[in-house]
């Protein structure tokens, strides 16, 4: 029991240090949309759970290696352990429960990012090798810059004129493939910008030799 308590305390310490370290690293870019807030909350929870699981595995492994290693001159056989039914059930059910919880939370997060607001600005987003085009049917305007109002939801209708592209603005967090094939393959995403700034639309699907240059300004 003494070793279990010590290892448990070490797990908590390592978990705390990992979480604090991850918060300082700032793995994610600026949060610039309502949808980003929802997604970042899920990311934050996932990072905390991953930090705990990492600490749980590494601490027990290293503690066993250094504390229970064979002593010099000890030639006796180690205790033979064939199995532990309770432990096997626990390490099967715990990951299963974790996956199910994150599946539910992920579904809720997805539903929140797709929640429709009245009078959303409609924008047709067309990808082609290797550029983006943005059409505003309500105003009969076409632009190579994505103009979006602050604190107003926009619904983006994504399509492609040639191969599969993927619309991604890291600061908005949302990402969705733009597919060729006509209206039946149009995909929709909703974005509500919250911070005034200059961002970049990036293609997140390998689409040809100039894929890396497929950028468009967002204002």
Q: Where would I find each of the regions flagged by the language model?
A:
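Alpha-helical transmembrane segments and their helix-start/interface "positive-inside/aromatic belt" motifs
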Residues: 1-12, 43-47, 88-93
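Alpha-helical transmembrane segments of integral membrane proteins, especially early/N-terminal helices
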Residues: 3-25, 52-59
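Non-transmembrane, membrane-proximal soluble domains of secreted or membrane proteins
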Residues: 19-45, 57-60, 65-219
